């Protein structure tokens, strides 16, 4: 339970000061994480008791929808969103310009007859330390191959176009003209570059493969698009009708960024006056410009519709990219992939994280007439064209609370993949399930129960908690002697199994340890700017 020094201010606000409303400034506090039920709280739960009957308003960054929803659900907070810090160019483009030009010349004209240029590229690559990130050799008299140059080109373009945050956002202070320009470019340039390239693809000027190649887009479209946008944004015309339709969204984003600062305070005052704080989706403005303007009441996603059709395609693509990278490096498919899922990415991608796991397993969603994902279908082995990959999924407490039905769906997916019989390729899910069952029986679990538990692959915080408990070990490093103690603490705190309705949240530490064993790939999808 919270100490009396924590309880006293909240109780004084209610009983002594007799406040009309409560305002928190995030992100984030700890009131929403005090002990008690995850959902359906009562006065016997600390979060509910400490807020009482006070209207609760919470200034919250629009970029952290995952944790914001916890405050909305456990403290009935009205989340008044505020802007994220402004964006800035990383300044890396100029540093890599010459290297990129040399790489493109080699790729366009071939490495034959350009040995000296190839040597120069390698020397510069080694000087910049890029070879270490890509695990390329640094032998000075051995130029890179065309395949290695393509990898180097993609990696360098990614760094050169990297976005980064500038100074902290100060509420009440509009972005400077420079910050406004850079943030508007960050929100709009990539989308416009791809739209321009898509139009060229439809006209037959480029191929679909080129359209899907980030390096190609970054080199052939992004510089021109940024130049067009910068010219328009630095001198916006008074008559918007004079602006070509493809540039109008960027001007709208600029106006929404300007309006956000005043809108944030106006929304708070409107709420305190008993008015409505209008709703809006939450998320990062770069990923979802619809969060603009800020100063609105942030909401989540309908978990039952996830993964939505776009997220399904994104998840498949990401899963295939993972497998391609692994097979390219190791010459074989991974047998088991471990995922760590947080609520924020689940919400902002509308389920692309789930889609990755489904596609690894070789199953796909089945939707009802309202777009809800209500069932799963096994993708035939011949259609999948590869082994079914075993998985283990670790989830945050926030994701467990907002998407419990999806965790059950993940377990159903594992069960479906485990029972697949049409195997033209190995089924690592089935072999993993058999091994799980065997290990459980050896530890004394009844054969019937071991069979039921063998398909469990989803684990999260125990006792309705929200923490791995690792922070405590970090803060009290003198209290442990061996790193194995930290690993054991992690298993103790994250070993609750989710996905089985009859045994929801049951602590299965041994099962969790077994599920984590022999993992080939570890992934935590993150995309916040």
Give the label of every model feature segment:
Residues 1-529:
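Ligand/cofactor-recognition surfaces for anionic moieties
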């Amino acid at each position: 339970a919270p100490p009396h020094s924590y309880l006293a201010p909240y109780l004084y606000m209610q009983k002594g000061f007799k406040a009309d409303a409560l305002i928190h400034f995030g992100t984030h506090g700890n009131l929403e994480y005090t002990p008690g039920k995850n959902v359906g709280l009562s006065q016997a739960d600390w979060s509910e008791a400490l807020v009482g009957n006070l209207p609760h308003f919470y200034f919250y960054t629009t970029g952290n929808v995952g944790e914001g929803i916890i405050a909305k659900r456990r403290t009935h907070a009205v989340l008044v969103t505020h802007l994220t810090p402004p964006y800035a160019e990383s300044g890396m483009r100029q540093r890599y310009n010459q290297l990129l030009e040399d790489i493109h010349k080699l790729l366009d004209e071939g490495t034959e007859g350009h040995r000296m240029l190839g040597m120069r590229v390698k020397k510069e690559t080694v000087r910049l330390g890029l070879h270490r990130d890509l695990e390329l050799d640094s032998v000075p008299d051995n130029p890179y191959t065309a395949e290695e140059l393509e990898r180097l080109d993609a990696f360098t373009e990614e760094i050169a176009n990297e976005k980064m945050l500038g100074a902290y956002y100060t509420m009440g202070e509009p972005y400077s003209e420079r910050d406004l320009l850079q943030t508007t470019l960050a929100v709009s340039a990539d989308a416009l570059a791809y739209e321009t390239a898509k139009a060229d693809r439809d006209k037959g000027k480029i191929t679909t493969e080129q359209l899907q190649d980030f390096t190609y887009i970054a080199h052939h479209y992004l510089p021109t698009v940024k130049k067009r946008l910068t010219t328009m944004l630095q001198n916006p015309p008074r008559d918007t009708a004079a602006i070509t339709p493809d540039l109008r969204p960027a001007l709208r984003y600029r106006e929404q960024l300007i309006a956000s600062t005043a809108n944030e305070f106006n929304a708070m005052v409107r709420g305190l006056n008993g008015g409505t704080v209008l709703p809006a989706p939450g998320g990062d403005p770069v990923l979802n410009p619809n969060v603009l303007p800020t100063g609105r009441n942030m909401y989540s996603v309908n978990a039952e519709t996830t993964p939505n059709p776009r997220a399904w395609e994104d998840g498949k693509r990401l899963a295939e990219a993972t497998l391609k990278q692994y097979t390219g490096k190791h010459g074989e498919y991974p047998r088991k992939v471990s995922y760590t899922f947080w609520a924020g990415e689940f919400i902002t991608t509308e389920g692309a994280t789930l889609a990755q796991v489904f596609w690894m397993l070789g199953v796909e969603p089945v939707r009802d007439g309202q777009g809800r994902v209500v069932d799963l279908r096994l993708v035939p082995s011949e259609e999948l064209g590869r082994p079914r990959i075993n998985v283990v999924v670790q989830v945050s407490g926030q994701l467990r609370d907002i998407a419990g039905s999806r965790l059950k769906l993940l377990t159903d997916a594992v069960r479906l993949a485990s029972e697949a019989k049409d195997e033209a390729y190995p089924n690592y899910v089935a072999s993993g399930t058999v091994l799980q069952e065997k290990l459980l029986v050896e530890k004394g679990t009844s054969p019937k129960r071991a069979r039921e538990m063998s398909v469990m692959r989803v684990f999260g915080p125990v006792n309705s908690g929200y923490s791995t408990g690792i922070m405590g070990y970090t803060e009290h490093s003198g209290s442990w002697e061996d790193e194995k103690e930290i690993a054991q603490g992690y298993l103790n705190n994250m070993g609750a199994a989710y996905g089985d309705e009859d045994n929801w949240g049951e602590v299965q530490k041994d099962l969790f340890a077994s599920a984590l064993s022999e993992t080939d790939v570890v992934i935590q999808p993150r995309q916040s700017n």
